[in-house]
């Protein structure tokens, strides 16, 4: 878990270039030093990097690096996964589905959340503020498969509006946090 505290930019007397590893959009990272952040950045790029290679990159002994990696894994790393290329597995269509409902009670949310969570093609699911209440990211083979998923979604719970947009091109996709 990141522990952030507000920092007064006038209070920091060190040049920004020296502070850049600990300043994130006006917040001071109290829990991680510059070496921790370098380790986390490297692991975000490739979580399979050997500790010896990581230690050489960061400028630490292998043992010191291993201890830091272990601590960071325990405190900050949610999970390590392989990120697959959807197109290589036949998922040629990415749909973003905006959902609006007139229901805003716990029972409806539980029903809708559980139902959506059972649909494997829904790879991301968010509750929103603004014009729509929920946003789904769906990966499917084509429009025919999307229509099948759409029909499953609208059967889960009462919805007042469902609007779909299809990605024409993926320009940027990353799981790395901007630390």
Could you say what each language-model-derived stretch is?
Residues 1-179:
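A compositional/biophysical signature of low hydrophobicity enriched in polar/charged and small residues
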